[in-house]
């Protein structure tokens, strides 16, 4: 039997407040997948947790042919993180601090940047959170900004994916935080993604929560639809929903499309428009450019197919993917200024080829200009 102690005399019980920092111990129990159960509770005489910084509850670089290391579009990620922190009352992280922190994390771990011949990347995970003791629903007095890195393969690999439209779960409320890169937008979908995988679907897709008639985004990636006319004209359509992340990879693909002379539209996409697309791709920092083989509506099992079972990548997805990969790895001229090089060049000079384009004048139709940036940015270094 544990002895119960009397109230401590070290506290003025009449003056105690919710902000009083006492440094009390806590109890921990850990669930291990290997055992399938929670451990017995243990009292830890310390208020601090020892948790890996890449634990999902808290939450790229590439090597060039010349041996240099470059970070892909860190300035855009800095702006996206600034947007996201502002939505949840975290103090703004200056862009100069963000960029310096990312560079320091990459250069200090530069031996883990994969060789330029590899399809792997160094994934960069910046994140911020309130770190001081606080029970009440008020802003904490202290915040942490961290940058972690880890070499990873492409998130979904190179194969085309079958996607399932979730009808029993809403990713984001109409006036909620769907446009921000915050943890609450990701943790709830894990249950549904796992169920979809068990049913044979590699990805899940969300409709808007208000009408259930418009495409928002995939759970892990942005959505792009590609239309090809009988005359061969190509059009890329991106959703303009106010409830989705401002995808850096989607923005890259739209800029590449304009560079090719393709038409680009950013507008609402009705679910009923899905059969009109020649290809659909999922785009994201970790996912890169992934072709979608089919899209199935969860409740009715109505299915739209884009690729046969033996095809892993559509023609236009391959063009976008190849161009993006070549720019990231500095195999071609970086005409967009996306690659931010860091550190010293260790080896010989290797020429890069010029990037192909089109003489056709590109058209950009920005039907709805309400675009939303994400937070807690993730990205790659090449």
From Swiss-Prot:
Involved pathway(s): Mycotoxin biosynthesis
Residues given in the record as pyridoxal 5'-phosphate binding sites: 80, 217
Swiss-Prot/TrEMBL cofactor(s): pyridoxal 5'-phosphate
Alphabetized InterPro entries for the sequence: Aminotrans_IV, Aminotransferase-like, B_amino_transII, BCAT-like_C, BCAT-like_N
Keywords annotated in UniProt: Aminotransferase, Pyridoxal phosphate, Transferase, Virulence
Pfam families documented for this protein: Aminotran_4 (PF01063)
Residues carrying N6-(pyridoxal phosphate)lysine: 181
GO terms of molecular function: branched-chain-amino-acid transaminase activity
E.C. number: 2.6.1.-
Enzyme class: transferase
Biological process according to GO: branched-chain amino acid metabolic process
Family named by the database record: Belongs to the class-IV pyridoxal-phosphate-dependent aminotransferase family.
Function summary: Aminotransferase; part of the gene cluster that mediates the biosynthesis of gramillins A and B, bicyclic lipopeptides that induce cell death in maize leaves but not in wheat leaves. The nonribosomal peptide synthetase GRA1 incorporates respectively a glutamic adic (Glu), a leucine (Leu), a serine (Ser), a hydroxyglutamine (HOGln), a 2-amino decanoic acid, and 2 cysteins (CysB and CysA). The biosynthesis of 2-amino decanoic acid incorporated in gramillins could be initiated by a fatty acid synthase composed of the alpha and beta subunits FGSG_00036 and FGSG_11656.
Protein name: Aminotransferase FGSG_00049
Record organism: Gibberella zeae (strain ATCC MYA-4620 / CBS 123657 / FGSC 9075 / NRRL 31084 / PH-1) (Wheat head blight fungus)
């Amino acid at each position: 039997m544990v002895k119960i102690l009397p109230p401590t005399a070290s506290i003025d019980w009449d003056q105690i407040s919710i902000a009083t920092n006492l440094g009390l111990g806590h109890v921990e129990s850990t669930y291990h997948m290997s055992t399938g159960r929670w451990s017995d509770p243990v009292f830890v005489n310390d208020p601090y947790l020892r948790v890996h910084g890449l634990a999902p509850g808290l939450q790229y670089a590439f090597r060039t042919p010349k041996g240099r290391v470059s970070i892909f579009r860190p300035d855009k990620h800095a702006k996206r993180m600034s947007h996201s922190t502002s939505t949840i009352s975290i103090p703004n992280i200056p862009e100069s601090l963000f960029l310096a922190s990312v560079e320091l994390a990459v250069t200090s771990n530069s031996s883990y940047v994969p060789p330029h011949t590899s399809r792997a990347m160094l994934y960069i995970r910046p994140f911020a959170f309130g770190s001081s003791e606080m029970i009440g629903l008020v802003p904490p007095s202290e915040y942490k900004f961290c940058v972690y890195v880890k070499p990873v393969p492409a998130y979904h690999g190179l194969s085309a994916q079958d996607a399932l439209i979730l009808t029993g779960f809403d990713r984001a409320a109409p006036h909620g935080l769907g446009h921000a890169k915050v943890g609450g937008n990701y943790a709830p979908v894990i249950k549904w993604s796992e169920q979809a995988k068990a049913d044979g679907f590699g990805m899940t897709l969300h409709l808007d929560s208000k009408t259930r008639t418009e495409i928002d985004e995939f759970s892990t990636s942005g959505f792009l639809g590609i239309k090809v006319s009988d005359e061969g004209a190509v059009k890329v359509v991106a959703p303009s929903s106010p409830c989705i992340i401002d995808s850096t990879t989607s923005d890259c693909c739209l800029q590449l499309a304009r560079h090719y002379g393709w038409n680009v539209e950013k507008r609402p996409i009705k679910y009923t428009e899905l059969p009109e697309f020649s290809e659909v791709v999922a785009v994201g920092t970790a996912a890169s450019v992934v072709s979608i083989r089919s899209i199935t509506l969860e409740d009715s099992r109505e299915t739209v197919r884009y690729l046969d079972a033996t095809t892993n990548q559509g023609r236009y997805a391959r063009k976008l993917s190849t161009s993006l990969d070549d720019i990231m790895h500095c195999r071609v001229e970086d005409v967009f200024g996306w690659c931010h090089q860091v550190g010293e060049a260790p080896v010989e000079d290797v020429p890069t080829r010029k990037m192909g384009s089109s003489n056709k004048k590109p058209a950009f139709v920005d039907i709805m200009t309400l675009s939303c940036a994400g937070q807690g940015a993730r990205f790659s270094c090449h």
